Amino acid sequence: MQLSDPLGDLLTRIRNAQRSRHATCVSPASKLRANVLEALKREGYIRGYTSEELRPGISQLRVELKYNDGEPVIKEITRVSKPGRRVYSKIKELPRVYAGLGVSILSTPRGVLSDNEARAANVGGEVLCRVF
C-alpha cells in the first residue's frame, strides 16, 4: 500500500504506541524518517531507534519510546507541513513551541534539525512537525 504522507504515518504510530504504553513501535524505513528520529533522539524525546532488514531492499525502523515515571515523554506530536500544504519558515520567523518547552523539527539545507539547532546554524526550512 502506498502512503500519501509517510512522515505523518510515523508520527501517528509513535503517538498511538505511547498512548498504549508500548515500549517500542515499528515503522517502514526511509531516510527522512530516520533523520527525524535522529533529531528526536538528540532532543531526548526517544531512547533510540534501530534499522532492521526484513528482506533484501525492505527495512523497518524500531523506535524505542521513552517514559518518565510511567508517563510518555512526548505529550504532543503533530505534523505541521503536510503534502497538501507545505509550511516554510525563515529562522527569524520560527515561533517557539510552548515558549521553548517543546521543539519544532525542520528540514533544512543542512539536514533535519531541531529548531534550537537551526537557530544555532542560522538556517530556516520546511517545518515538519512540533513535539512537546
Swiss-Prot record:
Any single Gene Ontology cellular-component annotation: ribonucleoprotein complex
Keyword Repressor: no
Gene Ontology MF terms: rRNA binding; structural constituent of ribosome
Signal peptide: none
Record's keyword terms, sorted: Ribonucleoprotein, Ribosomal protein, RNA-binding, rRNA-binding
PANTHER family the record matches: 40S RIBOSOMAL PROTEIN S15A
Protein name: Small ribosomal subunit protein uS8
Organism expressing this protein natively: Granulibacter bethesdensis (strain ATCC BAA-1260 / CGDNIH1)
